[in-house]
Amino acid sequence: MTIPKEVQNDYKRWYHFLEQEVQFSLSDSEKHTKEHCARVLLFALLIADKMGLSKKEREALCAAAVFHDSRRQDDWLDVGHGQRAADYYRDYCRTHSLSFDNRVYLVMAFHDRDDVLGEAALTEQKEGVSGGCLY
């Protein structure tokens, strides 16, 4: 499989960001590691490429991928880790140069909840870009 150049470039940039900027609460995890988030990042970019998503949608997917499991407290169900990751993302954006995207916040906040609730929250977005493809 040949990985498209745009996917490679986005992956390298966001992987570097993940390694340098995103701190994980559960440092001794065997499952939910930076490597796990890097795999999610790669698969998200490959799917986004196949779907023909816009740059803005790809950037949102990348941000969600690198932050989504950063605030886990255990490797099991850990209901609430999505909201904690969303809050971490929001706080990070406030104090750094990463632009905040409410769709990214919602994708993470509902990451460990019923999909129907997350899809409903994203549907309420009025940005002209479907959040459903990000969820």
Where are these regions (language model features)?
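Acidic/His-rich, divalent-metal-binding segments that scaffold phosphate/diphosphate chemistry
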Residues: M1-D78, G82
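Divalent metal-dependent catalytic cores for phosphoryl transfer on phosphate-bearing substrates
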Residues: E57-Y135
